[in-house]
Amino acid sequence: MTFFNDVEKVQYEGPRSTNPYAFKYYNPEEIVAGKTMAEHLRFSIAYWHTFVGDGSDPFGVGTMQRPWDQYSGMDLAKARVEAAFEFFEKLNVPYFCFHDVDVAPEGETLADTYKNLDEIVLMIKDYMKTSKTKLLWNTANMFTHPRWIHGAATSPNADVYAYAAAKVKKGLEIGKELGAENYVFWGGREGYETLLNTNMKLELDNLARFFHMAVDYAKEIGFDAQFLIEPKPKEPTKHQYDFDVATGIAFLKTHGLDEHFKFNIEANHATLAGHTFEHELHLARIHDMLGSVDANQGDTLLGWDTDEFPTDLYTTTLAMYEILKNDGLGKGGLNFDAKVRRGSFEANDLFHAHIAGMDSFAIGLKVANQLLEDRVLEDVIDNRYKSYQSGIGQKIANNDTNLKELEAYALSLGEIKHSSGQQERIKATLNQYLLRVNEY
């Protein structure tokens, strides 16, 4: 069965192409900084938005027209697998990601859910035998069903905690069976609405215990995946415990989990936390905890997670700058956790959206690499902090001074002189590099 009959395999045609089903900048074989674009840009398709999302919102029903939606139940799940691998092949993407309930419906009991999952996982595994597309990561959905109303690993109900543990155990087994390179934890319901009825310490300790059990079980079954935490400050919960990268680092280090986890950073979640995307990437990178990326963008005029496809070239450039500085994402990738707009309801809009996102990150890669080759920002930063390369500054940087010595030095100073930060000049230079992308 085929679902995208009027779309051929998407090819690179160059910046002057007017073909809406062609890449203008993403050339998977093009060499950038010693690697192909495909090696740098480990693109992934989000199963939930692409094959499950129906376009509904709090004010209206679904609008998406999907040829596989003529089916229901397990027949629908199987049709989505067929549609997914056709889409992967035509877009030539190396990875995909899913939550357990994306690929198979929940049953009346946990055992029924396992049975459904086993059947669909077997089907996915069979398709993967003849496909180049691999599983970047999988995860357990522990936020949609009413059982998660008060959380999963942070629920005040121990029965729910046990159910969540069972879901993750099954998820780890599925990840191993399908060769997932990572496993993600996103705590959409792990947080609180009010402190008036919350034992925060118990909830955080229980969450840490949960993660330790997951680490132990992955080792027990030989599942060598990178564990990832995906920060988000709010939505659906008022205050989520994985608020941002800084909060996540504090939690992981406090509970002795930092050796086992890195971060899966989503652009729109950074926006909701009051940060830029590059801020979260940078902070994770300098702590050696940048693991993977959910590639999307938010709307700064709106206060919720809009999950738009990434087309902001400034953002993709600065994101790829951080990723290149990180020497890539290792086992991670660029997962399009993004959905077409509610008014973009035709199935072929899925191709337009992903092509736009892939081209945007290809541009970001080329511009970021040129910035690095020309040491545009490195020279600016080195010059700005040059006072720490000699004299008293070098002693500070080398932990070779104390308050007494610094006081004596300060007393000997005359008027302190500053250098301009030159933000406007730097931004103008970035504009130049973006506008010259076709030269690189």
Curated annotation (Swiss-Prot):
Cofactor note: Binds 2 magnesium ions per subunit.
Active site (record annotation): 99, 102
Protein keywords: Carbohydrate metabolism, Cytoplasm, Isomerase, Magnesium, Metal-binding, Xylose metabolism
Residues that, per the record, bind Mg(2+) 2: 266, 269, 305, 307
Needed co-factor(s): Mg(2+)
GO MF term set: magnesium ion binding; xylose isomerase activity
InterPro entries in UniProt: Xyl_isomerase-like_sf, Xylose_isom_bac, Xylose_isomerase
SUPFAM superfamilies reported for this sequence: Xylose isomerase-like
Domain of life: Bacteria
Assembly mode: Homotetramer.
Name of this protein: Xylose isomerase
